[in-house]
Amino acid sequence: MGQKINPNGFRLGITTDHVSHWFADSHKEGQRYADFLKEDVKIRELMTTGMERAGISKVEIERTRDRVRVDIHTARPGIVIGRRGAEADRIRGELEKLTGKQIQLNILEVKNPETDAQLVAQGVAEQLASRVAFRRAMKKAIQSAMRAGAQGIRIQCSGRLGGAEMSRSEFYREGRVPLHTLRANIDFGKFEAKTTFGRIGVKVWIYKGDLTAKELAAKEAAQPSGRGRGGERRGGGERRRRNDRAERAPRQENAGAGAETPAAAPAEGGNA
């Protein structure tokens, strides 16, 4: 299961979080769940088209009643901001035109791009599009990630590798990448390289270590859960059942004594 599923969705609520934060319960046109979802997809498509050189890792979206907050995580914030903020103003204007709401645009820098799975996948894809040998590109990215502090990394390329007529998949791995361990902090990213032979898919898994018991407890405490109340109800039920048994014991004895008395009467009548 852990080998096939997307690691981000598999660990959602444990080590990862949603990239869209909003709630939709309206049935009005333009305010339904499907409308917000389509809008999120268009916002992310707008961020990726024409911004390949910016190294955008992820786009987080948060909605309020009349405002949309967009957080852009990028390895090169200067390209996104532009000269004197011209590029940021252009992006904000396009987003306001798309959503029809006020946009709060935040541009955040990725501190360690060598251990960001999405940025590593984009870097390998750019090298493949520039006709760099795929094995060389993969091994170079692995070495950079391990030097930057990653505990394990796996890179997989799928497609017509090296211009071969039949497509295949190859992967290289270094260190540990425990895909089945839920507390493992695994970053996952994917990207497509457009080459003259067709598209080559690049997938990257980066293992950054396990969450400690204290960190897991803090995350569980932050999430609302009814387990504690349920446990108390079960405990109280057990106590009540024990008390009921203690109260029923003398009743069963009395019932037994009462049953012997009417049984003796027919016996006497029979002898008579």
Swiss-Prot record:
Region (Disordered): 218-272
Residue spans of biased composition, Basic and acidic residues class: 229-238
SMART domains per UniProt: KH
GO annotation, cellular component aspect: cytosolic small ribosomal subunit
Listed Low complexity bias regions: 253-272
Entries under Pfam families matching the protein: KH_2, Ribosomal_S3_C
CDD domains in alphabetical order: KH-II_30S_S3 (cd02412)
The entry's keywords: Ribonucleoprotein, Ribosomal protein, RNA-binding, rRNA-binding
Cross-referenced InterPro entries: KH_dom (IPR004087), KH_dom-like_a/b (IPR015946), KH_dom_type_2 (IPR004044), KH_sf_prok-type (IPR009019), Ribosomal_S3_C_sf (IPR036419), Ribosomal_uS3_bac-typ (IPR005704), Ribosomal_uS3_C (IPR001351), Ribosomal_uS3_CS (IPR018280)
GO molecular function, one term: structural constituent of ribosome
Residue stretches making up the KH type-2 domain: 43-111
Biological process per Gene Ontology, one example term: translation
PANTHER family in the cross-refs: 30S/40S RIBOSOMAL PROTEIN S3, SMALL RIBOSOMAL SUBUNIT PROTEIN US3C
Function recorded in the entry: Binds the lower part of the 30S subunit head. Binds mRNA in the 70S ribosome, positioning it for translation.
Family from the record: Belongs to the universal ribosomal protein uS3 family.
Oligomer status and interactors: Part of the 30S ribosomal subunit. Forms a tight complex with proteins S10 and S14.
Protein name (database record): Small ribosomal subunit protein uS3
Organism per entry: Micrococcus luteus (strain ATCC 4698 / DSM 20030 / JCM 1464 / CCM 169 / CCUG 5858 / IAM 1056 / NBRC 3333 / NCIMB 9278 / NCTC 2665 / VKM Ac-2230)
